[in-house]
Structure formats: C-alpha cells, structure tokens
Regions:
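Histidine-acidic metal/acid-base catalytic patches
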Residues: 1-29, 78, 112, 137-154, ...
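Glycine-rich, proline-tolerant flexible connector loops at the mouths of alpha/beta enzymes
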Residues: 34-44, 86-93
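The substrate-binding groove and active-site-proximal loops of carbohydrate-active enzymes
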Residues: 54-61, 199-202
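Active-site acidic/histidine proton-transfer and metal-coordination neighborhood
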Residues: 4, 15, 19, 58-151, ...
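A generic structural signal for well-ordered alpha-helical segments
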Residues: 25, 42-45, 74, 118, ...
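Conserved beta-strand positions in the central sheet of alpha/beta enzyme cores
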Residues: 34, 49-51, 83, 126, ...
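N-terminal substrate-binding region of glycoside hydrolase catalytic domains
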Residues: 24, 28-41, 51-56
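Conserved radical SAM core fold
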Residues: 55-56, 88-92, 186-190, 233
Length: 261
C-alpha cells in the first residue's frame, strides 16, 4: 500500500520560513508537512495536519482560543486535521501534574467547544493520547472518546510506556484514527529523559510489523507523520540540523515500510 509520509516541522524548522521548510522536506523525500503553530500564519501545501498542542487543563480560555485560531487557519489552508492534546503538558516549564475531576472538566469542556468549531469549519480534531497529559493511555483516552466527538491522532510511542497493546488499540479505534505519528520509544511511565526516551524509528519497543498490519486491517489510508524527538542524537550527532534529521528519518521509514531502495 502506498502511504503519504509527512514530517512534523518542529525542531529548528520552526525558526525557518515555511517555504524553505516545505521545499527541504519535499527534497528529502516526504510527501507533505505537518505544520506547528510556529507557521500558523504561513501554512503551505502539501500539508497533512496542523499540530496545536495547547494545555486545556490550565490554559483556560487562551488555550481554547489558540485552538480556534488553528482550526480557522487550517480550514483556510485546506488542511483537514488539527492535532490536539488534553493537557497538562508536563514537559513545559511550570506545568503541574493533575488528574482531578476539575482538570477533567476543563479538558473535556474545552474539547467539546473545539470539536464544535472543527465541525463548523470542516476540520477534524485529532486527539493525541500523550504522556504527561490527562489522556495518556488507553483508559484515559477512551474516557475522552466516550465523552466528546473527536477523532484520534495515534502515536504508538506513548503506549510503549503504558504497556497498552498497540495493534489492539488501532483496531478498537478504527475509523476514528485520522492521523498517525511515526515515533518510537522505550522505558516506563515517568519523565522524558529519566524514565523513558524517544529514540530512532525501529530502535524502540513499538512492534512495527504488527502495528502496520493493524493499520492495514482497519483500512487506514491517511498520512504517517514522522515526529523526530530523539533530541540527544539530534543535538550531539546531527548538530541541531533539522534537514539531516528529516533525511535520516526518511531512510528509517523506508526500512520500516519495506520500500524499494
């Protein structure tokens, strides 16, 4: 099956003009770009999604409004998916770990409004279950999916730490999966860099053959977007060069997918 391979324009790409980022990624062999809010005012095609990772637990109205802005920008640019989190985002300075009912009410209430705005704009909202947030494993993600009409951005790396069965989750959520992140990890629940790390594709504990087979079984034909978060390698080996990271990752994707060399 031919797959659309995308790359999240994070890392030091966020400091570069959108046209330069897009051209660099297309030259590196990608089919599209997953933009972040760093480029929300200059979104260019081809694009797979717009990532808007606001903290809906403690961010209040400003977090919801920022997501509204992302939805409107995506709609104007012809981007069909905006990726979101519940929060709190524990990797951000000053973030506080919360798992109380007030936090859940804030996150679910914000997501309900965001879902309504997405529906009005014709943009799907992809919730990413993510470490350090309320929706971080199968059970907490399911709580959101049962309560709010949002879809799923599926990142298998986060379920490595929680021990949830990745292929089974893909089949459970099926048609609600609208975006997929290519990222690997190993470790246990805790803090990034201490208890677990995100590593190179194929070097962690994501069961890639089974994961890809599950995607085939549900008929997933959406984008697969590389999220490069092997930060130590990025800084110490690649010298903070995002183009080098993108090229390296594209080769790893080709190996995972069995693409001809």
């Amino acid at each position: 099956m031919s797959r659309e391979i995308s790359f999240i324009a994070a890392l030091d790409f966020e400091d570069r003009p959108a046209a330069e980022v897009r051209d660099s990624l297309l030259e590196a062999g990608y089919d599209s770009v997953e933009w972040t809010m760093a480029h929300v005012d200059e979104l260019l095609a081809p694009a797979s999604a717009l990532a808007c990772q606001q903290d809906l637990v403690t961010g209040g109205e400003s977090a919801v409004e920022a997501t509204f802005r992302a939805i409107d920008a995506a709609a104007e640019a012809g981007i069909g998916v905006v990726n979101v989190l519940t929060g709190p985002n524990l990797w951000e300075e000053g973030a506080v770990d919360r798992d109380d009912e007030e936090a859940w009410a804030a996150a679910l209430g914000g997501l309900e409004r965001i879902s309504e705005r997405g529906g009005q704009a014709g943009v799907e909202i992809g919730l990413e279950p993510c470490w350090g947030t309320l929706a971080h494993d199968a059970a907490t993600a399911q709580r959101v999916l049962d309560a709010v009409d949002v879809q799923v951005t599926f990142d298998p790396s986060h379920f490595v730490m929680t021990g949830d069965p990745i292929p089974e989750l893909i089949e459970r959520w099926g048609e609600r999966i609208v975006h997929f992140h290519l990222k690997d990890a190993f470790g246990r629940p805790g803090m990034d860099g201490e208890d677990f790390i995100f590593c190179m594709l194929g070097e962690g504990k994501v069961p890639w053959p089974e994961t890809l087979a599950a995607l085939d079984r549900i008929g997933y034909q959406g984008p697969m977007s590389v999220e490069f978060e092997a930060y130590r390698y990025y800084e110490q080996v690649l010298g903070g060069d995002p183009i080098a990271a993108a090229r390296l990752a594209r080769g790893q994707v080709a190996a995972l997918l069995g693409e001809p060399s």
